[in-house]
């Protein structure tokens, strides 16, 4: 089959070469963006006098018919026409005749595909921002329910200090708030129009790039045609931002997987977000959390893949850039699905408050409170740390906890101890007293909830 670009060729590629070089099996996802860009391009060609009114009307009518077919999923694509651009051009010519070939005036597939991806990512990033906000809303709701649910905070996966479970949930809210801000900021670099850059050097036709940018909703145009067709930093930024979101989700996945185990029993996932075993009848596996943790590696891989592709490319377009899309599509699907799953999973999970509270009483996470108690009475903190460490060792030897020690043992360690030490050892009191800004104290959590809600308003 003769290629639309085949004028200078005496031979056509072998079928397997066509199949290897074709991208239509994945870039067909850009069909609506490609048609949208073409409609704007046709309007501009008309405004600039390159197409007359009748030609422009006929072309746009044909494009709109193709758009309706695309929305109804009625378009049939062919490897013979390589990619989304040539497939749609062939369909347009079939629809309106040779006039369809005029649409490509003053345009290359190089600026065309870059325009498609800018349009695509603009829509997808806005959707992802909405999904992040929805998940944040659920985190705030869960936090509000558990402001006074006492929970062991960890360092090194060892119980460290008692905290509010709300404080833990809100930690992820603020991580996601930064993630959302990064996506919002990236829109400034996504909303740039490469349309009209041509293959690499612009065009001799009297086009109006600002006009097509306005029609397509872009904020401004690429100032350099070489840059406009050859860089993919806007995709790399998207993949990087997505990697950070997935990293944050993966950390929470790891905690959920631990928390719902028999060893912790801090939470129970709703049945709709767990699966069973084909062999072991008793199993309830946190598969969704495990899948998101695993899919994080896919997103990292997509970022590293495109970075590796880009690092050795001279200006401007190279066929290597055909490999920029599948990772982008995969990342969009992965991050959107992960956020939707997480929103439901956190919303429906059961928090075992009594188990959490018991965990803070059957450990030494209140040891810092004892050291602070002595320091507030004038003892150097390092000396207090040493004394409390020895008290913890005594407890370990006797199989008890600090709250079980007789008062005489405390006074033997230091005459600064008074009877109120047992109140200090209460995990609830320990949490309540953490009143520093950003801390786990209940008043601070209420302030944090107000700030979080303001961010979502």
Swiss-Prot record:
Keywords for this protein: Amino-acid biosynthesis, Arginine biosynthesis, Cytoplasm, Lyase
EC number from the UniProt entry: 4.3.2.1
Primary localization: cytoplasm
Molecular function, one GO term: argininosuccinate lyase activity
Pathway: Amino-acid biosynthesis; L-arginine biosynthesis; L-arginine from L-ornithine and carbamoyl phosphate: step 3/3
Pfam families found in the cross-reference section: ASL_C2, Lyase_1
Domain of life per record: Bacteria
SUPFAM superfamilies: L-aspartase-like (SSF48557)
Keyword Secreted assigned: no
Location of this chain's protein in the cell: Cytoplasm
Family under the similarity heading: Belongs to the lyase 1 family. Argininosuccinate lyase subfamily.
Protein name per UniProt: Argininosuccinate lyase
Species of provenance: Bacillus pumilus (strain SAFR-032)
